[in-house]
Amino acid sequence: MLLAFVWILAWPVAAFPQQKNSKEEFLVLPGEIGRSGGRIAVSLRAEPKTLNPLIAAETPSREIIGVMQADLVHINRATQLTETALAKSWKISPDGLQYTLVLRRGLKFSDGFPLDADDVLFTFQVYLNEKVHAPQRDLLLFEGKPISVRKVDLQTIVFELPKPYGVAERLFDGLAILPKHLLEKPYEEGKIGQLGTLATPPNQWAGLGPFRLKEYVAGQRLVLESNPYYWKTDAKGNRLPYLDELVFLFVPSADAQVLRFQSGETELISRLSAENFSVLSREQKDYTMVDAGPGLEYNFLFFNLSEPGEKTSARTLQELKWFREVKFRQAVSAAIDREAIVRLVYQGRGSALWGLVPPGNRR
């Protein structure tokens, strides 16, 4: 899916050229100049549950949120390098404890409201609040101590870490910056986790990504339109994205996804099984199959090591005791025939993994 969306944002089709405000500091992308207009339809196996990054836990929601929101810095998934994004620059103190980020000037949320350091402070305040239960919170804790954030001016924010962390820049990728002007009141009322349902009116939700909400039809589709305030342009100054619309069709059957793709109803499939890859390769018509190589995603099995409660059953207590034994976990790992899974489930289109770093990660 990652490769699909990289292609979407670079493909020559959508954002009408607009006049740039001289005070706006855009991120200019190199490469071939595209043309404006068009839409891409993507089939999803499951309907997303929310547009709220604070509670999104399942893949469909996170995929859609990913094109509606933006990060302070960006990790290029192809090169694994850290790149500028909402922050145009950053500086690290000699002791590695302080990160000073400078925002691009003149940036706006998808509803036209300006972005500044107060939005960043508000965002991290929300993520760190235990009562919000944001999944991002654990990333911002170091041995139980939270990262601290302070504003220097409207464009400059200082982050202080409790201890040095070699890849701290990556903390700023994957943390969507929230619109304080829309969310501060519900946050203070303890209702921020209730926001961002799919039925949310488009004018009540905003992000910093290339697309914004346009339409939702339950059980059928979710339509996003290009963000007219997006902060990236091509080399000629045309505001991106090129696409006018990005449409997600809810197609729960994998076979139905293939049929819709072959009929031209969709241009992308969010997840493709090995069986359907073979079908599309065998019946290839007016489309091209490309092997993009190994990705960064992987499937894994993990053990529940949480502390038992007062009502934990005797059987669960025994299982937790097993899980805490290193030799038991090693035995389970050794018992899994990874090569057979690759051969039988993925038809050879996968790789056995014995650690946390997938073969697609070349660094």
Kindly give the residue locations of the regions a language model identified.
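A generic structural motif
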Residues: 99-102, 155-161, 222-225
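A structural "hinge/loop" feature
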Residues: 27, 46-62, 86, 113, ...
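Surface-exposed binding/hinge segments that line
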Residues: 137-189, 215-217
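Acidic glycine-/aspartate-rich tracts in secreted/extracellular proteins
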Residues: 47-48, 106-107, 164-165
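N-terminal lobe/hinge region of extracytoplasmic solute-binding protein
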Residues: 20-26, 41-94, 125, 204-208
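Small-molecule pocket liners
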Residues: 40, 69-71, 99, 220-222, ...
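Bacterial N-terminal signal peptides
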Residues: 1-12
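Extracytoplasmic/periplasmic ligand-capture domains
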Residues: 16-32, 78, 104-137, 147-151, ...
